[in-house]
Amino acid sequence: MIQLRPHQERATIAMRQNSIGQILVPTGGGKTLIAIMDAVKRFEVNVPRTIVVVAPRILLAEQLCSDYLEHVTNANVLHVHSGETKHFRTTKSDHIKLFVEMCQTVREHVIIFTTYHSLHRVQESGIAVDTIYFDEAHNSVQRNFFGPTEYFSGHADRCFFFTATRKTSVTINKPGMNDREVYGDIIARVSAPELVKGGYIAPPKVYVKEFGIHQNAKKITCDVDCEHVISTMDDIDMKKILVCVRTSRQLMNLMAHTDFAQQCQDRGYSFLYITSKTGAVVDGKKVNREQFFETLNTWGKDPEKKFVVLHRSILSEGISINRLDSVIFLRNMDVICLLYTSPSPRD
């Protein structure tokens, strides 16, 4: 039996006492486990139930699936998005309906993992949803996502919104999480100081390194990027590093046209990255997405393992990296992305 942290326990109690609401927890505070424990509780009954988990990206939907299935063992899994997965996947509304109806016929539970882009397919299927969890719920206020969000807020038996960065609106013409009819009230809120005081997250330390001035950022070569990252790794004691690149092209140039990979290996670091163009790569070998995340989780849990993961915005998309202790920025970020891209080595 998992021992929840005090703030997680408060949140699960609030979810049992409310059928709709917002759960606001800082990055690294364990929002996913709160939802998982609620799902486990909902699946304890003999009556078949359907739970939907919504993520902003396919990568996160796949990682959430892996996290949920460590604890949810009595539900059939369906993915509704265009990504690859070992589970049954479809974006056709009639197939979604058929899948759920077949499971209900044999009185079995269903858990659906989808994205905001594909949520309307679940809506079109017309299935009855017991509970829906909106992960990184600030994404739901986007105009093209708000319709399905509003629908499930009114049609699902239970509806909960998880985020660290709540987005509100001051005009009736723009969706915002202060719309109580859609999002409900804030039923659980956790502050970052509480998590720091409890030792659950570590306050970030900022190191500023000065390099030579480049008048035109577009002329910064991949060799310069390599030099900047490697010198930072040499100057600061780091084990598990995220390098935030500007674009996939910058990442590909760094790996293909410099000795960055060899420099990492010479220092005892493994490396991995994943993009839509290159696919998933671990230490120079192409792997599938499931192998990528399995490797990322395994390395993250090993306190002695040193690795570098390169991505554009993996943390700001809600994807977690266990025991990440450092982030090197090669790009600018907006405030929300910057808040999400903070290491939480005690997670």
Model-identified regions with their sequence ranges:
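Walker A/P-loop
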Residues: 19-37
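Conserved strand-helix element at the start of the C-terminal RecA-like helicase core
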Residues: 52-53, 57-60, 233-258
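Conserved helix-turn-beta segment of the N-terminal RecA-like "Helicase ATP-binding" lobe
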Residues: 61-88
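Post-DEXD/H (motif II) to motif III coupling segment of the RecA-like Helicase ATP-binding lobe
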Residues: 142-198
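Conserved interdomain linker/interface between the two RecA-like ATPase lobes of SF2 helicase motors
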Residues: 186-245
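Conserved helicase ATPase core of P-loop NTP-dependent helicases/translocases
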Residues: 278-311
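A short beta-strand element within the Helicase C-terminal
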Residues: 320-332
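Conserved small/polar residues in nucleotide/adenosyl-binding loops
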Residues: 340-347
